[in-house]
Structures are given as C-alpha cells and as structure tokens.
Amino acid sequence: AHPPVSERVEVLRDALSYFDRQREEIATDITTLMGKPLAQSRNELNGFFERAEFLLETAETALAPETLAEVEGFHRRIEHVPLGVVFVISAWNYPLMISLNGVLAALLAGNTVLLKHASATAPIGDHFEAAFGNIASHPGLLQHAFASHQDAGDLIRQRQVHHVIFTGSVQGGRAISRPRRSRG
C-alpha cells in the first residue's frame, strides 16, 4: 500500500528543505555550468520554491478520487494510482524548474523517479538525488542517471520504466520516442 497523499506531501516538503539549505551552492552551480548571471540563478531558485509550494498545496485535490455521473447499473470512479518508475528526462535551460515539474509531480503521485538531466547541467541532478534519494523513511525515491540519449532509449525499451516525461530538443525527443514506440 502506498502512503496517503497527505503523508507524501509532508515527506516531500521536508526533502525540499535541502534546496533551501543549499540555496547558494545550487545557484553557484547553475551559474558555473551555464554562465547565467548569479542573480538569474538565484531567481530560478525563487521560482522553484513557488512552483514546489503550488504542487504541494494542490496535490491532495489533484490526486483525489473522482466520482463520475452514475450510468444505470454502473458506479463510475477515477482513481489516481502510481504507475511505478517514472523516467524524467530534463533539459538544461532551466535546470531546476524543468526537472521539478516532472520529479515532484511523479513523487507526489506515489511513483519513484529515475532522473536524467541534460549533460550540460548534469550536476544539478545530483542535488535532486541528495534531496529525494536519501529520505530515511522512503530511501531510493529518486536516482540520478548519467546517460546519453541512446542510453536513455535503451532504458525506455526495458519494461522497468513505466512512464516517461521528456523536455528537451527535437533530436533528443526523436531518440527517446523510437524506443518508446517499439515497446507497443
């Protein structure tokens, strides 16, 4: 059985505190990796926290079961259940925000995450693993993988990946979509 959404929210809120404790280091990493001015890197962190708070605040409502109108002889209901392993493939240009969208939504929904960050900003993925991969009560929720598009395609071909969230280039998208289609 998966923990209730309310418990996931609290566990993930605690995990996100890593980003606050490491705020200046993360901003400096973004600046070093991308050449962004430090002020812009700090602003991305501000946006990151706003987005995270929105996802945390809306999770219980968004993931609540939905009862649909009755049809004679049927009780209809939509339940949001975890898929399993979600492979989040993230772009480089907003290394925190783009990753957060897929990572936090997947974790809130009760999934585990394999994160492949863009090679240009791969060290940012280490911060996600430090925050979400080492939660004492839920170890291994997130693993950061260093992988080429080809390697990512090979991972997708395997049945251990249950869902893929991709943000990136057209070339990367093509490399990722071919193996996904071959799974059927």
Describe these PLM feature segments.
Residues 1-75:
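N-terminal Rossmann-like NAD(P)+-binding subdomain of aldehyde/semialdehyde dehydrogenases
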Residues 66-184:
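Rossmann-like NAD(P) dinucleotide-binding subdomain of oxidoreductase/dehydrogenase enzymes
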